[in-house]
């Protein structure tokens, strides 16, 4: 399946998009040849709107035979942004409401939690006890989020943003080793991984069975951009072959951030053409 991340919707309608904007966007997506889309609440102020109007969006998606591939809880970046937020219950009750919204989309089995760049005062330093307190707090909070998501019958994926306390995929592996948790997975955001200096070609094998979704975008590894695949220097043959070779059966979802709505159709068409070419040429498909 080829789909799009929420970047499609905020590129068309700004980050203050409404549920009605999503419905309009689905109709455009259908005409552009996509069959998957990702749900998102960008601003917490929209939470009640989504609680009351998600059913209408789900009905329109069914009418168009469009499938929600994951829910990105973008507004929950706040839950891991700094020490005070991290070491509190911030976001846990909101995640329960996210599961209520996602329940309107029975085929949507993944909820993605983006991890915020971690903030601290300029000039701050940490001793080993301070670091351990933060790390333990992060592990505890991720387990709490996972418990809520899994109680709804879904899986939790992490979107590892550059600068987050988790650090990268090695942080996810460490979390798994230290807590024994094997169910929390990874939303493979190629742009984030590449700008974190990850060895991107190895990630599908390294996290085989733990990649629950994708945000497929390009950049040049030194800036966290969201360009169409083919406009940066990511090796897309390696990424796509690796995913297929290691059993990934989910949607291939583009994430392209456009500066103006007028650019959206062409940018996503270009990205889609690149993915179709690479998928079509893969010997692992």
Where in the sequence are the language-model features?
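Histidine-acidic metal/acid-base catalytic patches
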Residues: 1-35, 58, 62, 80, ...
